[in-house]
Design a protein with these regions (language model features):
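Nucleic-acid endonuclease domains
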Residues: 1-89, 104-209
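Conserved catalytic cores of phosphodiester-cleaving nucleases, focusing on short active-site segments
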Residues: 93, 98-106
Length: 209
């Protein structure tokens, strides 16, 4: 799935979008759901033309979706195995046979005061607990093993840049995989509705600092 053409497409797409896109809404999402069937920028632009939808909204969704997919396959370059079912929303990859959901995300705006130092184990574990506590109710009920690739830029546009900075992503993910294949994945207890879940979860911190 991961190839140089896709990397080039994502870089080109990045130059066509701004960071301050409008808030997602169900109506525009339904209009632009074709993005999930477009494996290239060319196909996405063609579908935008055919559907007559807002170009930047569709491109922004395609960029976020395809960078997330690309991120999953970066793990596979360094020893993970991708799930055979591309429609499986619960499992993206396996590391040493253990299933994981991969989330490419940004440092949450709600935590703009930076309460957690993601360069430390304690900070990462506190952030992981925050992520699980602030998921949608549907996701919380599943309580899956998760790997969070967290982009921490100086602003929203730098976070967008980081999502397709494959040199930096490969560097951080390869380092994580080398350690994890030899030492296992961080384990953490998450309490939800009085029930304790013992999960494997970690954060791969992406920053230019």
């Amino acid at each position: 799935m991961m190839n140089s053409k896709l990397e080039q497409d994502l870089q080109t797409c990045l130059s066509m979008i701004r960071a301050d896109w409008k808030m997602q809404n169900n109506y525009l999402d339904r209009q632009t759901n074709f993005i999930y069937r477009c494996d290239s920028l060319e196909k996405c632009l063609e579908q935008i033309r055919i559907a007559g939808v807002e170009k930047e909204y569709a491109l922004h969704r395609w960029y976020n979706y395809m960078t997330s997919v690309a991120c999953e396959y970066l793990f596979c370059e360094f020893g993970a195995v991708h799930d055979n079912d591309v429609y499986n929303h619960d499992v993206d990859i396996y590391i040493n046979g253990i299933p994981f959901d991969v989330k490419l995300t940004i440092y949450p705006a709600k935590l703009s005061h930076r309460p957690y130092d993601l360069k430390t184990r304690t900070g990462k574990n506190e952030m992981i607990k925050w992520y699980y506590a602030n998921q949608s109710q549907q996701s919380r009920k599943q309580m899956l093993n998760r790997l969070y690739v967290v982009c921490d830029g100086k602003d929203a546009y730098e976070c967008l840049i980081m999502k397709s900075d494959f040199k930096l992503l490969r560097e951080k993910i390869s380092s994580f995989m080398r350690y994890s294949l030899n030492n296992g994945i961080n384990e953490i207890d998450i309490v939800d509705n009085g029930i304790t879940y013992h999960l494997k979860s970690d954060i791969i911190y992406i920053s230019y600092n």
